[in-house]
Amino acid sequence: MRPLVCVLWMFLFALLSSHTESVAVMSVDLGSEWVKVAIVKPGVPMEIVLNKESRRKTPAAIALKENERLFGENALGMAVKNPKVTFRYFQDLLGKRLDNPQVQAFEARFPEYHLVKDERRETVLFKLSEDLTYSPEELLGMVLNYSRSLAEDFAEQPVKDVVITVPAFFNQAERRAVLQAAQLSGLKVLQLINDNTAVALNYGVFRRKDINATAQNVMFYDMGTRSTICTIVTYQTIKTKDSGTQPQLQIRGVGFDRTLGGLEIDLRLRDHLAKLFNEQKKSKKDVRENQRAMNKLLKEANRVKTILSANNDHMAQIEGLMDDIDFKAKVTRQELEDLCADLFNRVSAPVQQALASAEMKMEEIDQVILVGGATRVPKVQEFLLKVVGKEELSKNINADEAAAMGAVYQAAALSKAFKVKPFIVRDAAIFPIQVEFTREVEEENHSKSLKHNKRILFQRLAPYPQRKVITFNRYTDDFAFSINYGDLSYLGPEDLKVFGSLNLTTVKLNGVGESFQKRSDYESKGIKAHFNMDESGLLTLDRVEAVFETVADEKPELESTLTKLGNTISSLFGGGSSVSETKENVTDSVQEEDEVPTEPTKEEEQESADPADKQQDKENNKEKGTSATNEKEEGKKEEEKAEPQE
C-alpha cells in the first residue's frame, strides 16, 4: 500500500466538475505485443486498468470476422484458426511505403497477409478481399478504441483524454500515423510521449525525495518485443520562475536498434521447432508452408523462451500441430543461445550509441535499470553487464507497467481536472531537422549561379517543446524551401533504408513579390518562417510573414507592418491536425541554442574581411536588436535565433 499512499499524497485534485462523466484521463502504452492502459480519476490516482479477463495487459491483436471484432486473447485464438484475418505487429507498418525494408520483412515473416499500396497516400494496406482493405492506422484505431472501452468500464465513466506512448525513434510520419489512429477512435490526444521518457518520468515520480541539486545519471535499457532502446537520463532539481525549486528529468543520450527484440528470438525458435518437426518425418508435408501450424509454433516458441529464462531445458509440445499430428521436442537454453548468438552480439550497440550521443562515459552513469520483457533473457543480461561494467543491473521498476504509469501521470498533469506536483520533463528530438533553399548569387565574372543553402532547425537531441524562426533576408520574389531531416550518418545503412525519404515537405511561398511591390517605400526586415516542435515531437510551420518597417521620418504609428503571405502551409505535413494546447506544469520552455551559420556569400566575406568592420557590424546589430524575435509580438520570446546570413 505504500506506493499507493505516496501517489495519493502527490495528487491534489482540484477544479473538479460537479458532473464527473468526463473527468477521468487515461494513458495507452502501445507495445508491439502488449497494450497496457492506465487511468486517473477522482479517488483513483494512477491505476492500471484490468481487461475483461482481469489481466493487467492485453495482447495487441485484432481479428476481423464478418460481423464481429475480436481483441486480445480472443483475437489470438482466432490466429490459429484463421491467421489471415488476425492482425499483430502491424505498428511496424505505420507511415511506411510498400518498398520499405520493414514492410518487406513483415511480409516475409507473415506471408498470410496480402499487402498492397494505398494509391492515395502511397502507404500500406491490408487487403482482405477485392472490396475490403484496412490500413495499419485503421487497425490501430480499433485497438485504441477497445483500450478506451476498457478504461471506461474500469473508470465507470466516459474517458476521452489520453496520452499515448510511442517509440522514441518514431519519425514525423510514424507519429502522425499514431495521431491519425487516435482521431479515428475519437480520442483527444493530450500528448504523444516517448516510451523511454514515460519510463523515466515514472521512475522519477516515485523517487521525488531522492532528487536534489546534484545531477544523477541513470541509464534505462529497454528491450521489448520488437526493438531495443537505451536512454541516459539526468535527474536534478532546478529553480523555476513560477513554482520554485522542482525536480527535472532531461534526456541526455539515446541509442536504439529497431529490430532487436524478443520477437526476433521467438521467430528464430519457431523456425528451429519447424525444422525439428520436419526432421521427425511424421508428415510428408513441409510444416513451414502451413500458416496455421506456423502460428501454433510461434506461440509455443514464446512459451518455451520464457521458461528457458529460468531453466536449462524444456519440452516443446503441441497437440495436433498439423494433420492431427502431435509435436514434441526437447529444447535447451544452449540451443536457443546458439540460434540467437548474432542477436546477443548486438546488445551493446544501443549502450554505446547512447553514451556517444550524450558525450558521456560509463563511469558517469550511477545505475543501469532494466526495462522490457526481453531483458529477462539471461544471455541479454550477461552481455549487458559486460558492456556497462557494473556489478549488477537494477530491476527496481515494474518493467511491464512503467511506461503506462508515467504516461498517465503526464495525462493528469495536462488535464484541466487535476493538479499534480510539477515534474519538469526535457525531452529530446533524436533526429535533426534542417531547412534547405537555393538562391541566385553573382560570381566574380558577373555571371549568375544558384547556391544551395542549409540551415539547421533542430540539432540531434535538441530539447523540445521549442519554437524557432528562420529569416530569409534576400528574397524579394516568390520562392520555395524544403524541410528535411539533417545529418543521419550516425544511423546504419539498414536504418536509413527503414527511415525512408529524408524530405518532410517543400513549402512554396506565393505573394512575396506582390508584397514587396506594394511596400516599395518600406524597409524589408526579411521573410520570417515560424516553426514549432510541440510536446509530441511533431513539427509544424505556424506561419510565414514578410516584415517591413517604415523609414525614420514617417509617423510612429506606422513603425512596423507585418504582411502575411498566402502560401501552401495551412497544413504543412498533412494527415492529422496539431495536438491540442496543453498546460505547462510538466514541461518547461526551452532556452535558445546557437546554430551553425550558413556559408557566407562573396559579398559577406568582403564585408567581414576587416576586423574593425566586423566589430562595428556586431555593435550595429546589437543596437538594432536583430534577433529572431525582433517583431511586434512580444509573446514569441522563446523562439530561437535562426537567421541565415545570406
Swiss-Prot record:
Keywords: ATP-binding, Chaperone, Endoplasmic reticulum, Nucleotide-binding, Signal. Residues 611-646 have a biased composition (Basic and acidic residues). GO terms for cellular component: endoplasmic reticulum chaperone complex; endoplasmic reticulum lumen. Its main location: endoplasmic reticulum. GO terms for molecular function: adenyl-nucleotide exchange factor activity; ATP binding; ATP-dependent protein folding chaperone. The keyword Endoplasmic reticulum applies. It is found in: Endoplasmic reticulum lumen. Residues 1-22 form the signal peptide. Residues 590-610 have a biased composition (Acidic residues). Belongs to the heat shock protein 70 family. Has a pivotal role in cytoprotective cellular mechanisms triggered by oxygen deprivation. May play a role as a molecular chaperone and participate in protein folding. This is Hypoxia up-regulated protein 1. It comes from Xenopus laevis (African clawed frog). The lineage of its organism: Eukaryota, Metazoa, Chordata, Craniata, Vertebrata. The gene is hyou1.
